[in-house]
């Protein structure tokens, strides 16, 4: 996802690498990985964001996700 963030690219990449390592360690297929990551996002929003802002944060996250998806045929 494109990021306009107060976090360094290095910090983001380190967390991403560690999360991917956990999924690989458990040999999680794509559908399970997406389910777990989606549940993680839901949990973060529900436990860390004020109720009045949850829908806006979820919509913003969904738009950022959609805009970051590549349309090429490689996978």
UniProtKB/Swiss-Prot annotation:
Pfam families: DUF1414
SUPFAM superfamilies to which the protein is assigned, alphabetical: YejL-like
Gene3D superfamilies, alphabetized: YejL-like (1.10.3390.10)
InterPro entries: UPF0352, YejL_sf
Family named by the database record: Belongs to the UPF0352 family.
Name of the protein described by the UniProt record: UPF0352 protein YejL
Organism from which the protein derives: Salmonella typhimurium (strain LT2 / SGSC1412 / ATCC 700720)
Gene expressing this chain: yejL
């Amino acid at each position: 996802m494109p990021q306009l963030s107060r976090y360094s690219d290095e910090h983001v990449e380190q967390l991403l690498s560690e999360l991917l390592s956990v999924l690989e360690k458990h040999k999680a297929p794509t559908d399970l990985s997406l389910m777990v990551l989606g549940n993680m996002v839901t949990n973060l929003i529900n436990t860390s964001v004020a109720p009045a802002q949850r829908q806006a944060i979820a919509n913003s996250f969904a738009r950022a996700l959609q805009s970051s998806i590549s349309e090429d045929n490689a996978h």
